[in-house]
Structures are given as structure tokens and as C-alpha cells.
Amino acid sequence: MIQKAFKMKLFEGKEEEYKKRHNEIWPDLVKELKSHGTSKYLIFYDKDTNILFSYIEMENEELWDEIAETDACKKWWAFMKDIMETNPDNSPISVELSNVFNLK
């Protein structure tokens, strides 16, 4: 299993809206995530910095990368762009984080 972590940034005061939207996540997006090998996806929020921390477990990085080309993902990005920092294509500005410790 491949593990990845990313950070993204939420706009000030948008935590509740972010939670609401994810509590109502679209079934077609969930289906795409799972069909592209995502087995676990957790998102945490740091209220002091508005940083979102995402942890993902996936079967295959190439499959994961293909999610960005799906209609469901592109629509979700457009839906979320008003509450978080995004790139010109509406994808979240995200920075991959390095794993520095793993207790086994």
C-alpha cells in the first residue's frame, strides 16, 4: 500500500463550509476515488494556520493521478475553489509532504 500526505490551504473562516461539503460528498466522486485504488483518505484541519493535511492510502500512484482527469473530480474542484487556494485549473494548490517517521 502506498501512503501519501499533502497540505492545502483553506480560506479564512471556511472550515464549517469545507466540513459540510465533505459530509455531503458526491457518490460519483467516492466511486471514482475507490475505483482508482484509494482505500483510505483522511483530511485534518489546523485552525491556527487554515492548513488542511490529507493522508491517503492507495494501491497505485498512476491510478491516483488519473483521478484528476475524471469529470467528477473536475466538478468537485470547481465546487471547492471558492473556499480554498487553487491552481488555474481549479485543482487545490497542494504540497506533497515527506514521511519522516513510521512506527511499525
From Swiss-Prot:
The keyword Metal-binding does not apply. It catalyses: alpha-L-rhamnose = beta-L-rhamnose. Keywords: Carbohydrate metabolism, Cytoplasm, Isomerase, Rhamnose metabolism. Substrate binds at residues 18, 41, 76-77. It holds the Pfam family rhaM. It is found in: Cytoplasm. Pathway: Carbohydrate metabolism; L-rhamnose metabolism. GO terms for cellular component: cytoplasm. Its EC number is 5.1.3.32. Homodimer. Involved in the anomeric conversion of L-rhamnose. HAMAP family: L_rham_rotase. This is L-rhamnose mutarotase.
